[in-house]
């Protein structure tokens, strides 16, 4: 299932008077789900820690974002994608969006997992690496082609790290529960 267009997510976010970018919303949602948080229509209230937050309109871009993200995280072909910024955005905007995504992921993951979850050694390392990325900024990159390639590699790393953490916190326990 494909993610909705980033512009549609941003538009609906503005309609709900949210201060978060599309990248931050997707990062928070991914963190929430990867940390074991429930897939529910009121996901915005949960990741924003605001019980008064209105649930996204059913069938709207934010609802589609939730549904597609859940499907992608559960996909056996590892089809998970990051929702960052519009295609063709300048390198600084793309790097800022990625680092914002990582910060929001950590927030959502922390809200869902709360106490320290049982992570594999690789999961621990992935979480630490995501925390380091969350501290970075676009100033760490130049507009050179090498940095464009480096950013693509970092995006791929983040994608795999999220799938690993989701596996540790959601898929592993689910599998163990079926065995018992």
Swiss-Prot record:
Listed InterPro entries: YgfB-like, YgfB-like_sf
Entry GO CC: cytosol
Top-level division of the source organism's lineage: Bacteria
Residues annotated as transmembrane: none
One Pfam family recorded for the sequence: UPF0149
Family statement drawn from the similarity comment of this UniProt entry: Belongs to the UPF0149 family.
PANTHER family (UniProt xref): UPF0149 PROTEIN YGFB
Protein name: UPF0149 protein XCV3523
């Amino acid at each position: 299932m494909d993610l909705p267009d980033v512009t549609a997510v941003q538009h609906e976010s503005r309609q709900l008077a949210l201060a978060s970018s599309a990248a931050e919303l997707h990062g928070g949602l991914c963190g929430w789900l990867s940390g074991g948080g429930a897939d529910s229509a009121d996901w915005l209230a949960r990741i924003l820690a605001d019980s008064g937050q209105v649930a996204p309109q059913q069938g709207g871009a934010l609802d589609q974002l939730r549904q597609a993200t859940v499907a992608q995280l559960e996909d056996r072909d590892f089809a998970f994608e990051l929702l960052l910024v519009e295609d063709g955005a300048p390198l600084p905007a793309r790097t800022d969006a990625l680092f914002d995504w990582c910060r929001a992921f950590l927030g959502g993951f922390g809200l869902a997992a709360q106490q320290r979850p049982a992570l594999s050694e690789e999961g621990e390392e992935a979480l630490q690496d995501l925390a380091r990325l969350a501290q970075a900024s676009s100033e760490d990159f130049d507009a050179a082609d090498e940095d464009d390639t480096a950013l693509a590699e970092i995006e791929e790393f983040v994608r795999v790290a999220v799938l690993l953490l989701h596996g540790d916190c959601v898929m592993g326990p689910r599998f163990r529960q079926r065995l018992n």
